[in-house]
Amino acid sequence: LAGFARAGQDGARATAGYYSKAGREEKGIVKASFFTGVIGGVLWYVLIYYWAAIDFSSEQIGLMGGIGSAVSVITYLFGGYLADAIGRKKLFLVGLGCTIAGLLLFLTEKNLAVFTVGYALTSLGGSLEWPSLTTLLVAKTKPADMKFLYGVQGFVNQIGLTIATFLGFVGPPIMEDLLGPETLTGFKLVFLATTICAFVPIIYVLGVKETERKPSSLRAHFNKRTRRILFMYSFQNALIGFGAALVIPWLPVIFNRSLGASDMWVGMIITLSNAVIAVGWFVVPKFAEFRGSVTLIAVCQIASVAPLILLPYSPALIVVAVLYTVRSFLMLVPQPVLNAYVMNITVEEIRASFLSLSQLAWQAAFAGSYVIAGYLWANDYTKPEPFYYAGALYVAASLIFFAYFRRIKESHELAPAIT
C-alpha cells in the first residue's frame, strides 16, 4: 500500500512536471480537450436523462441511441484513413462541425426523427474528432512519455466532463426554482451552452502544426502481425462496447427511476465519480511501471465488475455513489495508459486508422446493444439482469486482452522499434 501511495504521488508529480515543460501546441490540444469533455459529458450522461424526462420510452431511447451510434460505425470505416491521408487537424474540425449541427437540433421541440438525426450527427462528429485529436498528440512527445501526456489530457478532459454533467443535471431544476422557467427549458439552455463551448476547440486546434508526411500506402503498414493485433484488440473492444450499452448510458435514469435519486442526487453521484476519475487520470501513468500497462488495464477492468453488479441492490443512495465511483474509477482510470499503449504498438502511418477500426468494433457492438437494451429494460429500470450480462462481457474482454497483449511490447521497450 505504501508503494502504491508513493507511486500515486510520483505519478502526480511526473504528470504535472511533464505538462509544465510541454510546448504551446501540446498545451493547446490539452485545452481543447477540456471543451470536448464538456460536449462528451452532456451527450453521454445528460442527453438520455433529458429524453426520459420528456417521456420517450426505453424502446424509443434505445432506437435513437442505436441508430445514432450506427452512423458513427460507418464513419469509423473511413475516418481513420482520412485522418492519416489528409491530416488529423482538418478532420477534427470537420467532426466538430458535425457535432455543433447535431447539438443545435436538440434545441428543437420533441421529435423522434429530429433527435435521431441530431444524435447521429454528434456521433459522426465524435467518431471523427476522437482519433484525430488522439493521434495529434502522438507527434508531440516521445513514446516513453506518451502516457504522461495522455494522463494530463485525460485529466483536463475529465474536468470539463465533470463540470458539464454536474451543471447538466443540477442546473435545470435550480433554474426552475430561482428563475421560474420549466425544467425542460433549463435542459435546452444546457444544450445551448454546450453548443457555444463546441466552437472553442477550433481556436486551439488551428494553432497546432501538423507534420506533413509523404504519401504512402497504408496497406503496406498493415502487415500480418499488425492485422492480427488489430483483430484481437477490436474483438475485445466489441465485447466491452456491447456490455457497456446494456447499462452505462441508462444509469442516470436507473438512479432516478429505480433507486429514487432526485436530479440533485443524480448530479452529485455522477459528479463525484467523474471528479475521482479526473484525479486518477492525473496519477495513474506511474502505476503502469509496477507490472506493465497490460496487467494494470486488465486487473482494473475485471475488478470494476463487482461494484457494477452490486449497484441495483444498493440499500441507500450513498452506497450507490460509492459503488458507482469505485466502478468508474477502476474501469476508466487506466484509459490514458491504454491510449499510450495502443499508440506505442502501432507505427505513425496507421495510428489513426488503427484507432478508428478498433473503435468501429466497439461502436458497432454498442449500437446494436443499445437497441437491444431498450427492449431489455422495457421501461422497468429495476431489473438486475442487464448488470450481470454487462459484467460477464467485461470479464471476458479483459481476460482476452491480457492473454494476448501481455506478449506485445511497446515500441520504447524494444530495440529496434516495431515496424
Protein language model features and the residues they cover:
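Helix-to-loop junctions at the C-terminal end of transmembrane segments
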Residues: 75-87, 280-292, 377-378
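Cytoplasmic helix-loop-helix junction between adjacent transmembrane helices
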Residues: 120-157
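C-terminal membrane-cytosol helix-exit motif in multi-pass small-molecule transporters
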Residues: 195-214, 400-405
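Structural signature of the two symmetry-related core transmembrane helices
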Residues: 90-105, 295-310, 388
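Helix-loop boundary and gating motifs at the non-cytosolic
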Residues: 11-70, 229-270
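Glycine-rich segments within core transmembrane alpha-helices of 12-TM secondary carriers
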Residues: 151-172, 361-370
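A membrane-interface helix-boundary motif in multi-pass transporters
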Residues: 173-195, 375-394
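Central cavity-lining transmembrane alpha-helices of secondary-active solute carriers
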Residues: 63-81, 271-283
